[in-house]
Amino acid sequence: MRDIAVFSGSAHPDLAEEVCAQLGVPLSPTRVSRFANDCLEVQLMANCRERDVFLVQPLVTPVQEHLVELLMMCDAARGASAGRITVVMPHYSYARSDKKDAPRISLGGRLVADLLVAAGASRVLAMTLHSPQVHGFFSVPVDHLHALRELAAHFRQYDLSRATVVSPDLGNAKEAAAFARMLGAQVAAGAKQRYADDRVSISSVIGDVAGRDVIVLDDEIAKGSTVLELLDRLRESGPRTIRLACTHGLFAAGALGRLSEQPDVLEIVCTNTVPVPADDHTDKLRILSIAPALAEAVRRIHNGESVSALFDARPAG
């Protein structure tokens, strides 16, 4: 197999540029055009024959547009005789659709996985899937990265002697516990029940947060309804400080503004798995780059080295 070729869709070209800068390779151009009937056409503007092709495209708003674009990129690479096609998908939005929790409901996580493989993907590189079991939906290898090292390196600048990592729900408690171990902190979790996409109820917080420096950790923040509900429960216990952290800062429907307006929230930390428009930035927002981690994973995949070893090493910081 020949050298690496990295292409980016239109979802997050800045991240693809960062990854290529870390790898020391150029970002190959992609042409996306739209016909009068609203159909898309994608052309990869560099040779792919027998090359190790990496396609960078998080599934962010507009999700369906970016998904079709990614499928066409896979198809174009396969048609151009690529040696291997790895989809670098820092955010897989359909990971939320991972179970049949209502009659006659679609299972988007599995369907989109099948579509990517059918389009030509030979491997997937993902970051902090909303439901980790989703990687089992793929019939090709999936390398599942997380951003805990990057987040931990950021929070180590503070005094963590009274820190407690709080998961908004028990489903994310395992990741919160791992993060707490990295920081030498305590861990707590909210008792959450979801009624709709933007309607949640957190009845209590399980764990010690009174007088503590709280770091709320979630995999993603979309509308922010869960975090706002959790903040109400935390205030009842009287934490000393509150900071928010997530991997995917989606911040839909003005969520970033609402969270930044909370006077007791000192900081909102996310990574650049998804683009946050500059006009939405606030003084409390901190965006950490996961480009070095993605680039190292790409390098290891290309060279046939272990990707899981990235997490066996001592955490960053």
Curated annotation (Swiss-Prot):
One of its GO terms (cellular component) is cytoplasm. GO terms for biological process: 5-phosphoribose 1-diphosphate biosynthetic process; purine nucleotide biosynthetic process. It catalyses: D-ribose 5-phosphate + ATP = 5-phospho-alpha-D-ribose 1-diphosphate + AMP + H(+). SUPFAM superfamilies: PRTase-like. The keyword Kinase applies. CDD domains: PRTases_typeI. Its EC number is 2.7.6.1. Residues 211-224 are annotated as: Binding of phosphoribosylpyrophosphate. InterPro entries: Pribosyltran_N, PRibTrfase_dom, PRTase-like, Rib-P_diPkinase. GO terms for molecular function: ATP binding; kinase activity; magnesium ion binding; ribose phosphate diphosphokinase activity. Transmembrane segments: none annotated. Keywords: ATP-binding, Kinase, Nucleotide biosynthesis, Nucleotide-binding, Transferase. It holds the Pfam family Pribosyl_synth. It comes from the Bacteria. Belongs to the ribose-phosphate pyrophosphokinase family. This is Putative ribose-phosphate pyrophosphokinase. It comes from Streptomyces coelicolor (strain ATCC BAA-471 / A3(2) / M145).
